Amino acid sequence: MFQDKGWVLVTLIALVTPSWAAYKLQERYSWNQLDFAFPNARLKEQALASGDYIPQNALPVGVEHFGNRLFVTVPRWRDGIPATLTYINMDRSLTGSPELIPYPDWRSNTAGDCANSITTAYRIKVDECGRLWVLDTGTVGIGNTTTNPCPYAVNVYDLTTDTRIRRYVLPAVDTNPNTFIANIAVDIGKNCDDAYAYFADELGYGLIAYSWEQDKSWRFSAHSYFFPDPLRGDFNVAGINFQWGEEGIFGMSLSPIRSDGYRTLYFSPLASHRQFAVSTRILRDETRTEDSYHDFVALDERGPNSHTTSRVMSDDGIELFNLIDQNAVGCWHSSMPYSPQFHGIVDRDDVGLVFPADVKIDENKNVWVLSDRMPVFLLSDLDYSDTNFRIYTAPLATLIENTVCDLRNNAYGPPNTVSIPKQAVLPVGPPLYTKQYRPVLPQKPQTSWASSPPPPSRTYLPANSGNVVSSISVSTNTVGPAGVEVPKAYIFNQHNGINYETSGPHLFPTLQPAQSGRQDGGLKTYVNARQSGWWHHQHQG
């Protein structure tokens, strides 16, 4: 009898435990506040004293992975942001709270040096040709105090040589007085020269296409799908209610190349629960900017509380997207209809994933998620004794396992009938070409589709204090509902960067001998704190 009661108790516990209790994303890096790899302690002290560096004013918003580097962007929303485009040397910093290294160097992060530097970067993209695409918005500040010392400019870097190989200034005809662009999608066709970039103008309500080969851009602006939904402008994140009702086209993802040689661009306005689509055949054609209304397709709504700012699609058609109202990351397999029953949640965390600002899939099908508590930063006050910013990672196969997006383990059907007009959506073929990449360190074993052990429960890697975060600390000085202007996604900066006469992205190591609690020259032995985690690194030599 007692055995039967015990079985019933276990069953009840299993029934009430949410499906995301066994966390799949694993925390790789975390910070109470961001730190930067200054050339030396004296220059850092000078920057702190002058206001060129104010640690509490830095918020990470974008992440991208390539080889042994993890790129992180920090917009110049407030004073004291020394660099906007940075990276982590993953060989030296396997976990913890590493200093951010300016990329490609300090001089290239000087705000206001329009021709030679990046003033503010948001989300960035590495393509399969080893190029890093960065849109410099040229702005400092946020909301009504935003200024534009520089024009919008596309900057492309060769990640093999760490040099800028292209700078293209968007012409005035492609922007308007309300323009704000924070997202980029890169479309590679038959070769590396057959490349296009697409930019979502969130507040100017347009979509800009740029051709690498032509070194030219054009704007699609005459479409209602770029505008916010007036019924979807109310947001609730981390116990804060706010309205971003003006936010239009924002997150974008690109499908694999289809049988006709083109991709599908999926996008959503931020103030919306709906996804839209258009073929890149239309976007690549400058002559279609004014007569393409009916080439855009409206898909279903995702359901309630499904605002999203970032999305990405794998080369086999699996889309991941952040769900900022739900502290979660969702998924959809593009071979299925775009309806709520075919949307899954791959992970959720009401502490660690508060505002998962960016989601990326790298060349090895590993997923990277950056969370930053942005609404708390903008509308209240962060507690800098708490962990505020985190970067998570996991293999894509692990994330979608046992979700509706894992078609190999589920018998869902029928195939998706939603397609771009005049085009057939056929199974995705092999890539047209491949390119060698630098090895990712540390290596992670591949997860089998056929059989995989349950993902480990999440135990946070030790931060500076070594304590597990159990709650979000938010200042009691919350913003009232009346008479308060909610900042948009972009306060004037009097100290706009540091112009150090140094060069080379690898000049300054991230681990200094004088730093307390750190080893010079890298970690000699590292085993994932979960004991059964993915990373196991033995320092050679």
Curated annotation (Swiss-Prot):
<dbReference type="GO" id="GO:0070451">
    <property type="term" value="C:cell hair"/>
</dbReference>
<dbReference type="GO" id="GO:0005576">
    <property type="term" value="C:extracellular region"/>
</dbReference>
<protein>
    <recommendedName>
        <fullName>Protein yellow</fullName>
    </recommendedName>
</protein>
<comment type="similarity">
    <text>Belongs to the major royal jelly protein family.</text>
</comment>
<dbReference type="InterPro" id="IPR011042">
    <property type="entry name" value="6-blade_b-propeller_TolB-like"/>
</dbReference>
<keyword id="KW-0964">Secreted</keyword>
<keyword id="KW-0325">Glycoprotein</keyword>
<feature type="glycosylation site" description="N-linked (GlcNAc...) asparagine">
    <location>
        <position position="144"/>
    </location>
</feature>
<comment type="function">
    <text>Controls the pigmentation pattern of the adult cuticle and larval mouth parts.</text>
</comment>
<dbReference type="GO" id="GO:0048067">
    <property type="term" value="P:cuticle pigmentation"/>
</dbReference>
<dbReference type="InterPro" id="IPR017996">
    <property type="entry name" value="Royal_jelly/protein_yellow"/>
</dbReference>
<keyword id="KW-0217">Developmental protein</keyword>
<feature type="signal peptide">
    <location>
        <begin position="1"/>
        <end position="21"/>
    </location>
</feature>
<dbReference type="GO" id="GO:0048082">
    <property type="term" value="P:regulation of adult chitin-containing cuticle pigmentation"/>
</dbReference>
<dbReference type="Pfam" id="PF03022">
    <property type="entry name" value="MRJP"/>
</dbReference>
<dbReference type="GO" id="GO:0005737">
    <property type="term" value="C:cytoplasm"/>
</dbReference>
<keyword id="KW-0732">Signal</keyword>
<dbReference type="GO" id="GO:0048065">
    <property type="term" value="P:male courtship behavior, veined wing extension"/>
</dbReference>
<dbReference type="GO" id="GO:0042438">
    <property type="term" value="P:melanin biosynthetic process"/>
</dbReference>
